[in-house]
Amino acid sequence: MKSQSELAIVLTWLAVLGTAQDDADYCAELSTQSLAKILGQAFNPRYMSIDPPGEPEEKSYHLGYKRSSYELPFYADSDAISVSHFPAWETNHFALVEKKKEAPRSKSLRTRSAFMDRVGHPRIDGFKQRPWECSSKINWIDLGLNYFPRYIRSIECIARKCWYDHFNCKPKSFTIKVLRRKTGSCIRINDKLILITAEKFENDYTQLWIWEEIAVNFCCECVMLY
């Protein structure tokens, strides 16, 4: 009786694994090169990275991306907005305009973040913190396997107060668009996808990737909230 139960469990697992393999064969995975072509002008080398932080950047160079010698730090929060449920290659993301929540009115002073090196450590170049400046540090955020690019840089305000404790340090933000894979969703490959990626697909279906908008903060500024 016990052996029959064990056999039933084994057969069930084999069936599940077989189904997963069939799904993988049925739904083709887009290559990094194809995703980079779909992302197109939305890729900003100052704020995004395809490769893990600290690794050589040859892969990015092969994809046609080259990092700027002067990279602005920024921060990405956890809020993300799906700007479209259609395939990313079918949507002109530059034409999509989202209404942003109005931020509190603020009066800001001229600010500058502390200089940082590539790995997020402050540079010791005789830098002296000024009263109207907010010190900050850079972190890397891993968005996970379902995002492209996967890695984005973030800045965290270290100081809470500025201008002799009369003003507050506040991150200044804007938005970037990245690709997000909708897990469990496949879509038929069409001529437009083939034209953009120039990829030869062996399957008729591929994974569905959509545009997602993420708010990022690129600096810390000294402000007085009303």
Curated annotation (Swiss-Prot):
Localization per Swiss-Prot or TrEMBL: Secreted
Gene3D superfamilies the record matches: Cystine-knot cytokines
GO MF term list: receptor ligand activity; signaling receptor binding; torso binding; transmembrane receptor protein tyrosine kinase activator activity
GO CC, any one term: extracellular space
Keyword terms of this UniProt record: Developmental protein, Secreted, Signal
Position of the signal peptide: 1-19
GO BP: any one term: torso signaling pathway
Family of the protein in this entry: Belongs to the noggin family.
Function (record text): Required for activity of the tor receptor, could be a ligand of tor. Involved in specifying terminal body pattern.
Designated name of the protein: Protein trunk
Organism this protein belongs to: Drosophila melanogaster (Fruit fly)
